Amino acid sequence: MSDDARFQQLNCWLDSCLPELFVAEGWGEVPPAELIPASSDASFRRYFRWQGGDRSLVVMDAPPPQEDCRPFVKVAGLLAGAGVHVPRILAQDLENGFLLLSDLGRQTYLDVLHPGNADELFEPALDALIAFQKVDVAGVLPAYDEAVLRRELQLFPDWYLARHLGVELEGETLARWKRICDLLVRSALEQPRVFVHRDYMPRNLMLSEPNPGVLDFQDALHGPVTYDVTCLYKDAFVSWPEPRVHAALNRYWKKATWAGIPLPPSFEDFLRASDLMGVQRHLKVIGIFARICHRDGKPRYLGDVPRFFRYLETAVARRPELAELGELLASLPQGAEA
C-alpha cells in the first residue's frame, strides 16, 4: 500500500473512532482538526499528532506485516500497572496497525538535556526504571536469551563489516570474533533477569508530568539487569564524561539494591557486567545503523557510529578480557568508525 493510501486509511479510521472516544471521555463534539507528522524512527512506524481545539492526541501508524501493535499494547499495560508514565491507549485497530494515544508532550529528554539539569532529569528516570524492574515478567515477556544475544551481535559482522566496510571475518579473525561473542553472551546470561525496555535512552523519555513519559517500549524482553541503565548513560545520541557515568551507575546500583532489585553483590561486579553488556549493545547498534543505511536508505544514523566506537575503546581499555576485541577493532580499515 502506498503512503498516500495508508494515510487515507488512517484518516478514515480516525473519523470512525473519534466521535465515540469524545463521548466516552466527556470531551463534547469532535472539533475541526489537523493531522501533522510528529516523528518517525528507525523502524517502519510513523507518528502523527492530531490537533483539534485545545486537545492534542498522538496516532501511531505501524503498518503490517512489518510492524505489530500488539506488543506495544501489552507492554504499555505492564508499565502502567507499575506506575510508569506511558501513553494511554484511547483507541486501537490492531489488525490494521493503528493506535490512538494520549500525548505525553513535544520535548524529549534529548531535546533539553545539558550538564546542569542532567541529574535532576535522570533521577526520576532511574525511579521509573527501578519501578518496572520490580515487575515479574518471567514467562510474560519473551526471554532475552542466548539466541537473541547472538543474533544481535551478528549484525556487526553482517552489516557493518561485510556490507558497509567490505570486510569478511575468516580464519583467526573469525575465531577471535567467536570468542568475543562467547564472553559477552556468557556475561549477559549470568546476570539476574528483569524487565528490559531495550531502548531506555533520552530520546525515548519525554519531558512530561510526571517525568519521564516513557515511549518505544514495544520490544521489551525479560533479560539482563544492567541493560537499561547502561543504555541510559551510554546513549546513541549524547555522551557523558566517564566520571559522571561511573557516579550515575553507582547511584543506580545503591538505589536499586535498596529497592530489592536483584543485582551483582558488589559495585565492581556490577560495573564489569555493565561494561560487557554495553559492548554487546554497542556492537549491535553499529550493525543496526549500517543496516538502516544500506537496507532502508536512511544513512543519517551512521553519523553516530563514531560515538559507539569510543564507547568500545573505553571498555577495551578498562577490561583486559576485551583485549581480543581491541585487536579486532585495530585491524579494521583506517577510519572505519567514520
Curated annotation (Swiss-Prot):
Belongs to the kinase AmgK family. Sugar kinase that catalyzes the ATP-dependent phosphorylation of N-acetylmuramate (MurNAc) and N-acetylglucosamine (GlcNAc) at its C1 hydroxyl group, leading to MurNAc alpha-1P and GlcNAc alpha-1P, respectively. Is involved in peptidoglycan recycling as part of a cell wall recycling pathway that bypasses de novo biosynthesis of the peptidoglycan precursor UDP-MurNAc. Plays a role in intrinsic resistance to fosfomycin, which targets the de novo synthesis of UDP-MurNAc. Keywords: Antibiotic resistance, ATP-binding, Carbohydrate metabolism, Cell shape, Cell wall biogenesis/degradation, Kinase, Nucleotide-binding, Peptidoglycan synthesis, Transferase. It is an enzyme of class 2 (transferase). It comes from Pseudomonas aeruginosa (strain ATCC 15692 / DSM 22644 / CIP 104116 / JCM 14847 / LMG 12228 / 1C / PRS 101 / PAO1). Disruption phenotype: Cells lacking this gene accumulate MurNAc. Deletion of this gene increases fosfomycin sensitivity. Growth rate is not affected. The keyword ATP-binding applies. It catalyses: N-acetyl-D-muramate + ATP = N-acetyl-alpha-D-muramate 1-phosphate + ADP + H(+); N-acetyl-D-glucosamine + ATP = N-acetyl-alpha-D-glucosamine 1-phosphate + ADP + H(+). Its EC number is 2.7.1.221. One of its GO terms (molecular function) is ATP binding. PANTHER family: N-ACETYLMURAMATE_N-ACETYLGLUCOSAMINE KINASE, TRNA THREONYLCARBAMOYLADENOSINE BIOSYNTHESIS PROTEIN TSAE. InterPro entries: Aminoglycoside_PTrfase, Kinase-like_dom_sf. Transmembrane segments: none annotated. One of its GO terms (biological process) is regulation of cell shape. This is N-acetylmuramate/N-acetylglucosamine kinase. SUPFAM superfamilies: Protein kinase-like (PK-like). Pathway: Cell wall biogenesis; peptidoglycan recycling. The keyword Transferase applies.
